[in-house]
Amino acid sequence: MHQTKTGILLANLGTPDAPTPGAVKRYLRQFLSDKRVVDTSRLLWWPLLRGVILPIRSPRVAKLYQSVWMEEGSPLMVYSRRQQQALAARLPDTPVALGMSYGSPSLASAVDDLLAQGVGHIVVLPLYPQYSCSTVAAVWDELARILAKKRAIPGISFIRDYADHPDYIHALAASVRASFAVHGEPDLLLLSYHGIPQRYANQGDDYPQRCRDTTRELVSALGLPPERVMMTFQSRFGREPWLTPYTDETLKMLGEQGTKHIQVLCPGFAADCLETLEEIAVQNREVFLEAGGEQYEYIPALNADVAHIEMMVNLTAPYR
C-alpha cells in the first residue's frame, strides 16, 4: 500500500517585512482588508482604511516596530522561524513549512513548498491556542482559496485550536514558575489575551470561552488561588465595544488600588511580537507603575521553548 507523505504547515498572522512606514502600510492594508478581521461594509470601510487609517497609523506603527526590531528581523518572524526549525529538527522525516495569513512567507508559498517535497497530506497547525473567527478561520479561508486553484489537492488535517491541551498548559505553567523563581511570586498574575469585538462573540465566536478554558486549566496547574489571577483583553482597535475587562484599564485600576507587584502572561500568543514586546512589556508596564505599582514583569511567550516544540510534536502526532 502506498504511504502518503505528511508535512506540517505552521500558520501565524504575519508581520511587515521592515519597520518602515511603507512596509507597515502594505502589511496593514492586507491585514485590515480581510473581512474575517474587519467585517464592516466595504463601501464604508475602504475609504476609511485608505484615506484615514493607513496614512495615520502606518508611520506611528512603524516607530513601534523599530523599537522591538531584532537583528534578524521582526520578532514574530524570528521566533516563528525558530519554531519551524526546531520542529523540523525534532521530526526529521516530516517536512515543516511556515506560512503567514498576511505578508510573507505566504500560506500559498508554504503549501507549494510542501507539495514540491512530495507531501500528499498536510497537517495545518494555526499557532493560535484559542480559536477565533478573526485568526484561525482566516487561515481556513485562505487555505481554501489556495487549494481551489489546484487540480490535485492534498489531504488536509486542520487543528482548530489547543486552548486546554495538557502539553500547552504544562508549557505555560513551567514558564510562569520560572518567572516566579527569578522575580518572586507577584501579588497578582495577569493573563492578557488579544481582544476581539464583543459583537463577534455575540454572533457565535467561542473565543472568550476558549480563553476561559485556558485560564481555568492554567490556574489549576499552578495551584494558585483564583483571586490571585485575572484575565483581561488587550489590543482593542476602533470604537465599538471589545471583550472586557481591558488590560490597560485594569492595570491602571490595580495600581491605584494598591497592588504592588504584577506579572503578565499573554497565553494567546505563541510567539513574541509587537503586541507583547511593546504593548505589554513597555506601554502597559508604564501604565501600572505610573498608577502606583512598584514591580512589573512580562513573562515571555513560549516561542521555541523545548516544551512548546514538544507540544507541537504531540499535537500533530495523531495526524502524521
From Swiss-Prot:
In which domain of life is the source organism classified?
Answer: Bacteria
Gene3D superfamilies, per database record = 3.40.50.1400
Q: Which GO terms describe its cellular component?
A: cytoplasm
Alphabetized Pfam families for the sequence: Ferrochelatase
Tell me which EC number(s) this protein carries.
4.98.1.1
Q: What SUPFAM superfamilies does the record tag this protein with? A: Chelatase
Catalysed reaction(s)?
Answer: heme b + 2 H(+) = protoporphyrin IX + Fe(2+)
Q: Which UniProt keywords apply?
A: Cytoplasm, Heme biosynthesis, Iron, Lyase, Metal-binding, Porphyrin biosynthesis
Q: Which cysteines form disulfides?
A: none
Instruction: Give this protein's Gene Ontology molecular function annotations.
Output: ferrochelatase activity; metal ion binding
- Specify the pathway: Porphyrin-containing compound metabolism; protoheme biosynthesis; protoheme from protoporphyrin-IX: step 1/1
Q: Where is it localised?
A: Cytoplasm
Q: Name one GO biological process term.
A: heme biosynthetic process
Q: Which residues bind Fe cation?
A: H194, E275
Family from the record: Belongs to the ferrochelatase family.
Q: Relate the protein's function as given in its record.
A: Catalyzes the ferrous insertion into protoporphyrin IX.
Q: What is this protein called?
A: Ferrochelatase
Could you read off the lineage of the organism from its UniProt record?
Bacteria, Pseudomonadati, Pseudomonadota, Gammaproteobacteria, Enterobacterales
Encoding gene, per UniProt annotation? hemH
